[in-house]
Amino acid sequence: MRKYEIMYIIAPNLEEAANKEIIERFNGVLTNQGAEIEKVEEMGKRRLAYEINKFREGYYVLLNVKADADAIAEFNRLIKINDNVIRVLITKDEE
């Protein structure tokens, strides 16, 4: 298993409960695929550097996980389908 850092931005027009539901759903996707979530950091609502899908701000979430490539591929596939997530970045954490 490799270490990955995942950052995604949720649309700002959702309520706090909806944000929590999205975060829990995607954490569940990773754990169901056998990944270990080391850290979840909800960075809150921040201004974007440029407009994405007509939004000027977004709700940032940062994850540090240990996972196989298959788990990351499934996470990436499902998060890109979700209309409430406006951007995602997945990087390998080289230590």
From Swiss-Prot:
The keyword Ribosomal protein applies. The keyword Endoplasmic reticulum does not apply. Pfam families: Ribosomal_S6. GO terms for cellular component: cytoplasm; ribonucleoprotein complex; ribosome. GO terms for molecular function: small ribosomal subunit rRNA binding; structural constituent of ribosome. One of its GO terms (biological process) is translation. It comes from the Bacteria. Keywords: Ribonucleoprotein, Ribosomal protein, RNA-binding, rRNA-binding. Binds together with bS18 to 16S ribosomal RNA. NCBIfam families: S6 (TIGR00166). Belongs to the bacterial ribosomal protein bS6 family. HAMAP family: Ribosomal_bS6. This is Small ribosomal subunit protein bS6. It comes from Halalkalibacterium halodurans (strain ATCC BAA-125 / DSM 18197 / FERM 7344 / JCM 9153 / C-125) (Bacillus halodurans).
